[in-house]
Each structure stands twice: as C-alpha cells, then as structure tokens.
C-alpha cells in the first residue's frame, strides 16, 4: 500500500542519514547529511505519493496538498517552493535515468533546465533513490544506481559550471 511504501521511504532516508546502508551508497550517505534542511527531504518522502487514489496525476495533486500544508504551518516561501517542486517532480529523475541516454549532453541540458539549482538536484537525487528503494527491494539494483549517479554527477557539473559563469558575468557587470 501507499502507507507502507511511505514508511519504507522514510526509513530508508533515516538509514542513509545514519550510515546504515550498503557501502555502494557512501557518497549518498555523505550527501544526505549535507542537505541544508533534511526535514524537507523527510517531508517530501511523506508527501510524495499522498495524491495517489484521488483521481488525476498524483504528483500534481500531492503538490497542491503540500502547498496547503506549508501555508498552514507558515513555511517560508523558499521551503514551500522546494517541497512542492520535489513532490510534483519526484518521478522525473528516475524516468529520465531509465528512459533516456544519461551520457547525452542534451539529456543533461533538459534535465538541469527543470532542476535549475544544485540544491534541488541534491534533494531530488536523495528522494529518488529512497523512493525506488522503498518500492520493492528487487527494483533497486546497481544498474539503476549507476544511471542515477551518472545523471546526478553530470547535472552537478553542468549546474556548477553555469553558476561559475553567472558569477563571472555579475563581476564583469560591476566593473
């Protein structure tokens, strides 16, 4: 059920955070502990499938639910936007990594256009891995991990490069 899956996703996040994971997830263990607000990842894990069974696209329905939740609890605009984006886009990284060529620069360009920040990339990577691992133990394997990691690393390089170029143009404008 969705409830069981949600508990497994959150459990996986916690195990990753404290390091109770396969050694192949060492980088992910380090990354999850560098997230600025890990509670947003946990909330994304709780909310990501909440729209299922309500008729329509569960990602979009979940996005609306999380927006109301954040508003009711006076979350900052930034945190509301990040959490809503994560819920709405929680399937994108898995889909792109498994249905397109993660080595193709065009794939990376299109993916990073949607993600557009390193912060979102880090969160969506953590959510995606723990979502897949929480779905069915046989769904998670080294092939899927390698594809996701390749998409993550290539996207991180591209976003870092864009950030450096943006900073250089800001400095040039100030001269």
For each of these PLM feature ranges, what is it?
Residues 160, 164-175:
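Extended, charge-enriched "interface" segments that sit outside catalytic cores
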Residues 28-161:
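Divalent metal-dependent catalytic cores for phosphoryl transfer on phosphate-bearing substrates
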Residues 1-45:
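Active-site-adjacent "gating/activation" loops or surface patches in catalytic cores
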């Amino acid at each position: 059920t969705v409830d069981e899956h949600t508990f497994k996703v959150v459990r996986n996040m916690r195990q990753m955070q404290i390091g109770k994971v396969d050694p192949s997830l060492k980088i992910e263990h380090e990354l999850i502990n560098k997230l600025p607000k890990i509670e947003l990842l946990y909330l994304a894990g709780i909310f990501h499938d909440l729209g299922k069974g309500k008729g329509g696209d569960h990602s979009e329905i979940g996005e609306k639910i999380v927006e109301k939740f954040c508003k009711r609890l006076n979350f900052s605009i930034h945190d509301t936007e990040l959490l809503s984006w994560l819920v709405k886009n929680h399937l994108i990284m898995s889909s792109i990594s498994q249905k397109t060529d993660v080595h193709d620069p065009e794939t990376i360009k299109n993916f990073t256009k949607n993600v557009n920040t390193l912060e979102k990339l880090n969160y969506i990577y953590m959510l995606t891995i723990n979502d897949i691992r929480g779905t069915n133990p046989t769904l998670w394997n080294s092939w899927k991990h390698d594809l996701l990691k390749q998409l993550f690393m290539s996207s991180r390089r591209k976003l870092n490069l864009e950030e450096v170029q943006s900073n250089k143009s800001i400095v040039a404008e100030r001269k």
